[in-house]
């Protein structure tokens, strides 16, 4: 038996749409997070933190005190199946209560400078004069709450002082 070559009037592979239609409820993406010596919390590529994980984080805070640094996922302003959006990232950062929180994993819908403005407003640096519509929309997605220090991370950012609650970095 030799190779079969379809006639030129037939496609060599079945023609089928690449689109898929969800068949059920979309469930949030739970990924691994890391807590290092009670002072650094890293949660990336996640859109949900289960209650039992929150219980572990809260117990650790009782034992070790306030975490120094939290590094938290934020793909874009709107939530995604497998990533936090701005609202979820800020809510998570508030609940973790670290001295400083940094966001990672952005796509390119919003510029780094715009994320700096939006997240800076969360700790009271809220000078909205001349803000772009994207920035106004972004801050509007974040629920009101206690001010916290939260900024977008970037390549080359160096964070020091994880012990003792005095956190410094080479950019902010």
Predicted regions: what is each one?
Residues 50-172:
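Binuclear metal-ion centers of metallo-dependent hydrolases, dominated by the metallo-beta-lactamase
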């Amino acid at each position: 038996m030799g190779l079969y070559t379809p006639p030129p009037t037939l496609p060599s592979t079945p023609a089928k749409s690449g689109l898929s239609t969800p068949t059920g409820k979309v469930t949030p993406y739970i990924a691994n997070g890391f807590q290092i010596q009670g002072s650094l919390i890293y949660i990336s590529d996640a859109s949900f933190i289960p209650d039992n994980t929150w219980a572990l984080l809260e117990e650790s805070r009782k034992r070790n005190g306030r975490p120094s640094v939290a590094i938290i996922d934020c793909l874009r302003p709107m939530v995604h199946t497998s990533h936090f959006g701005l609202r979820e990232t800020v809510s998570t950062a508030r609940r973790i209560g670290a001295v400083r929180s940094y966001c990672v994993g952005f796509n390119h819908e919003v510029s780094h400078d715009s994320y700096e403005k939006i997240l800076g407003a969360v700790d009271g640096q809220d000078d909205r004069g001349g803000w772009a519509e994207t920035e106004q929309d972004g801050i509007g997605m974040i629920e009101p709450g206690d001010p916290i220090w939260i900024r977008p991370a970037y390549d080359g950012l160096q964070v020091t002082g994880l012990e003792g609650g005095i956190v410094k970095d080479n950019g902010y």
